[in-house]
Amino acid sequence: MRISLKWLSEYVDLPAPEELARRLTAVGFEIEAVERTGAELKGVVAARIAASEPHPNAEKLSVTRVDAGGGEPLQVVCGAKNYRVGDVVPLATVGAELPGGARISKAKLRGVESFGMLCSARELGLSADASGLLILPPGTVPGTPIGEALDLDDVLLEVNVTPNRPDALSHVGIAREVAALLGQKVRLPKPGLVEGGGAAADAVKVRIEAPEKCARYAARVVEGVKIGPSPAWLARRLERCGIRSISNVVDATNYVLLELGHPLHAFDLDEVAGHEIVVRTARPGERITTLDGKDRALEPDDLLIADRDRGSALAGVMGGGDSEISAGTTRVLLESAWFAPSGVRRTSRRHGLKSEASYRFERGADPGMVIPALDRCAALIAGLSGGTVRAGVVDAQARKVASPEVRMRWDRPAQVLGMPVSREDARRILLSLGFEERASDGDAVSFGVPSWRVDVSIEEDLVEEIVRTLGYDAIPETLPGPAVRTPAESAEAQAVARARAALEAAGFSEAVNFSFVAARDLEPLAGGLAADGIALRNPISADLAVMRTSLVPSLLRNAAHNRRQRVEDVRLYEIARAYGPRAAGTPGDAPSHEATEVAGVLLGRRSPVGWAVGGDVADFHDAKAAVQGLLEALGVEAAWAAPGPGWLHPRTSAALRAPGGAALGELGELHPRVAEAFELPRGVLAFRLSLDALLAAARLVPQYRPIPRLPAVLRDVAVVVEDAVTAAAVEALVREEPLVEAVILFDVYKGAPLPAGRKNLALAITYRAPDRTLTDAEADAAHGRIVARLRERVGAELRG
């Protein structure tokens, strides 16, 4: 919004432009630019033509002598013919630079010296008229700077008005803010309306058929108008604010729009069929040609200003071409109304049509400005066009748009702002902004909100008005009282963070998937995982139709997608919720439940091929190592038992259980039918763990163990056992020896010369006593007891 300070100064006394810009920015109206006009015409003054005679050497030129207010007349050669001796015209003196870039210098034209240039409006950058010299008003004093003579000197502010403050989209709106800041009263413009002739109600009728979209529609009639150009002062004001001058009547509506902020529209009354205005919604198939020349198909939601036969305007957006003001207009119907913002907004967007009127109506016009703006504009049209305003207003009011009343506790500003605010200051500020003090009960007061403030509805809005006017910089800088404490991280959050770190350290990348999958993705996993997912009522697509009962299907689809993109080595994990029907006997009333899972998929090579590394394919032990690292990160002890559930291969899978027997999850190679269903090769490994079960068995708080100060004794043992004997069972028997500190399985071997059905397990055992240094004899005795225990319990044979 462009604001002219010369125009604004008619309503309120102003400080220096820079100070005004600073103060307005501080209260929420950011000043994006400050532009000074008239300065570009420095060196151009008013000059009276004292004499003129033909050029001795050029028929089309004249030699004039002009009085520029500096004593001796100046000789200027001129080519224009539209002047007479005694006229006052603009003179660009020697040294002046015109807007087009031309610098004036002393010159000799066809043998005659010229000391300047007499200018047209085009040469001054004021208009496109280059037909002759710009003739100034007769009383203009020679030597007056042209900016002053033509009222060109001004300062323009480019104000960024936020969408919640439509009341500030006018000069009077900004004047209200300035007056409140400076402790002044606004000098509102007086309509100066003089009525005559017959009654307006005899010339036009108004009817509202859509009260929910139009609360009020008022009209005046001006007769005997003569359409013509606007006076220079009015045209200049409009142009400075970015609006092109059209004619005196149309310019009057735009002038009041910029002055008071209320949109108006002028119709040619003789083009209004039946001299009747009907405010209604569009009928099926109805069309209208708007002022921009476009024929538009209307929707039933569009609000029309219609006459007896057809639509004449899109209400609050743009007028129609059938009833626009033309050169032959003699009777004007002037409209002032209040339209519902939502309806104007929808119509404007639907038709891609933006106007100064729609910009204001869709943000919320002032219902209290309907009649004042109408009277002001009618008086202006009558004065500019020589017309007569018929008596009275044709006013149709379908409903009243009431302004709210807001109650404020006197101590509320101090509570919100953290600084003391006296009752006197709060009352003074709100009254200066147009609020009306009403009922008071000692501790609180009610204020009536002015009709133009559509953004104020609650107590905090009043507090905002107070602090805006006081200045945000008045709020003292204070440090917070109590120390800020970081909330303790939940056990689940700690477990998730540790699980992520452990899996990423093992080379896995995190995947993030939808919680929805295709129903067909659950069917192959029926052995061990719920196959009946919760169906969505409105799925995104058939491939995302049910809630996933496990994270595994999503990860298998990720792996298949990577393979299609020629990515053969894949390690992915996901930590998220899975959903399924609630099992019978479980607590809760909901028919479904959700639980957090940790799942992963692994396929391809164990590590990238390099000069020192081969291309070994990852197997069950790689997946187990990753899961084991996760368990250790959470402090979970788990027992491994083969085989795993049915969706895993029976020979290369295992189920995990906590020491108390609670199920933790499973790990292993995909069953061939599952791999085939997801278009994956054999050998793909996957794991699924319940985070809730892991949390129940976890030791997230580290247990202190002192660094051993006594040396350990290391022994290796290799035993041959049946295939059915698990390494975990052997390890558990070894740990029964009190002096054993650690056991590591470092080799498993099957094949010749071992007989079929047997395997070799090699373990590294660490012995240590907490209170003494072990002797070799003590270590050998413990080692012997372990071998005997293995031979007795699992039929192990010591391999030499």
UniProtKB/Swiss-Prot annotation:
Quaternary structure note: Tetramer of two alpha and two beta subunits.
Source organism of the structure: Anaeromyxobacter dehalogenans (strain 2CP-C)
Q: Which cofactor does it need?
A: Mg(2+)
Q: What is this protein called?
A: Phenylalanine--tRNA ligase beta subunit
Q: List the NCBIfam families hit by this protein, alphabetically.
A: pheT_bact (TIGR00472), YtpR (NF045760)
InterPro entries from the UniProt entry: aa-tRNA-synth_II/BPL/LPL, B3/B4_tRNA-bd, DNA-bd_dom_put_sf, Fdx_antiC-bd, Fdx_antiC-bd_sf, NA-bd_OB-fold, Phe-tRNA-ligase_IIc_bsu, Phe-tRNA-ligase_IIc_bsu_bact
- Name the domain of life: Bacteria
State its location(s).
Cytoplasm
GO CC field = phenylalanine-tRNA ligase complex
- What catalytic reaction does the record list? tRNA(Phe) + L-phenylalanine + ATP = L-phenylalanyl-tRNA(Phe) + AMP + diphosphate + H(+)
What EC number(s) is this enzyme filed under? Answer: 6.1.1.20
- Which residue range or ranges hold the FDX-ACB domain? 708-799
Family recorded in the similarity comment: Belongs to the phenylalanyl-tRNA synthetase beta subunit family. Type 1 subfamily.
Per UniProt, which keywords does this protein have? Aminoacyl-tRNA synthetase, ATP-binding, Cytoplasm, Ligase, Magnesium, Metal-binding, Nucleotide-binding, Protein biosynthesis, RNA-binding, tRNA-binding
Under the heading SUPFAM superfamilies, the entry gives: Anticodon-binding domain of PheRS, Class II aaRS and biotin synthetases, Nucleic acid-binding proteins, PheT/TilS domain, Putative DNA-binding domain
Q: Which GO terms describe its molecular function?
A: ATP binding; magnesium ion binding; phenylalanine-tRNA ligase activity; tRNA binding
Domain spans labelled tRNA-binding: 38-147
Describe how the cofactor binds.
Binds 2 magnesium ions per tetramer.
Q: Name the CDD domains on file.
A: PheRS_beta_core, tRNA_bind_bactPheRS
Entry's Gene Ontology BP terms: phenylalanyl-tRNA aminoacylation
**Occurrences of domain B5 (ranges):** 401-477
Q: Which Pfam families match?
A: B3_4, B5, FDX-ACB, tRNA_bind, tRNA_synthFbeta
**Residue numbers binding Mg(2+):** 455, 461, 464-465
